């Protein structure tokens, strides 16, 4: 059991002074207001509720540091960044996604984020493309291992662009038809079964018909 004393804490009904939070197994078990600190308390100035990361692509954590560069021709742009992102996306399998997402989620938790909306479009494991929902399970494992609260938002990605009705080769691991996507969404709702939330994402006007 751990106790934290906050000089000020933001509770559901607003700010309170001299608040003690008692934690059991990593969760807040008891909240007391108007109490003096004692020697066993960890003392903090302010405590606020955990934040929510409202838009995450966890696999891109592995891209950090690989795109902070300039070409000699100075022609870098979002589109050159996207090519490197696609290269990474095509190489991430389920085992790698679990490890990358676990690291990203642990970093979120240590920074004060206690929930995450994961906008996910790596729907197929490149090493085992016929194994259904391996990448979904990888994210669930990462969230469970880290302890973050997950909202899974599968993203529909149908085509390469307005004038190209088919996905490009480097998009095939995550491109889906609408009926495939709706089936994935239904399976995700059943798989999470109350342990998290499931949303629906459409990538963009460019990528969705």
Model-derived regions, located:
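Hydrophobic alpha-helical hairpins/lids featuring a short glycine-rich hinge
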Residues: 88-130, 136
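N-terminal metal-binding scaffold of metallo-dependent hydrolase/deaminase domains
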Residues: 1-36, 46-47
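Active-site gating loops and adjacent loop-to-helix segments of metal-dependent hydrolytic enzymes
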Residues: 62-97, 126-131, 159-179
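Histidine-centered catalytic micro-motifs
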Residues: 49-61
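Divalent metal-coordination and catalytic microenvironments
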Residues: 7, 26, 44, 55, ...
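Metal-coordinating catalytic core of metallo-dependent amide/deamination hydrolases
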Residues: 126-209
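A cross-family signal for N-terminal binding/gating loops and helix N-caps
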Residues: 40
């Amino acid at each position: 059991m751990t106790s934290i004393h906050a000089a000020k804490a933001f509770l559901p009904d607003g700010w309170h002074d001299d608040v003690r939070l008692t934690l059991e197994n990593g969760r807040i078990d008891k909240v007391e207001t108007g109490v003096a600190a004692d020697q066993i308390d960890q003392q903090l100035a302010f405590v606020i509720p955990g934040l929510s990361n409202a838009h995450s692509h966890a696999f891109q954590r592995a891209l950090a540091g690989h795109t902070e560069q300039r070409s000699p021709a100075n022609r870098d742009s979002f589109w050159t960044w996207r090519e490197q992102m696609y290269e990474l996306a095509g190489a991430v399998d389920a085992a790698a996604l679990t490890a990358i997402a676990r690291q990203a989620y642990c970093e979120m938790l240590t920074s004060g984020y206690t929930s995450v909306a994961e906008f996910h479009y790596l729907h197929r494991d490149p090493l085992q493309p016929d194994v259904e929902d391996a990448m979904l399970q990888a994210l669930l494992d990462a969230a469970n291992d880290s302890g973050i609260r997950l909202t899974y938002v599968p993203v529909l990605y149908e085509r390469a662009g307005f004038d190209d009705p088919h996905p490009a080769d480097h998009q095939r691991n995550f491109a889906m038809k609408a009926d495939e996507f709706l089936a994935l969404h239904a399976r995700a709702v059943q798989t999470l079964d109350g342990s998290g939330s499931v949303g629906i994402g459409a990538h963009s006007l460019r990528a969705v018909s």
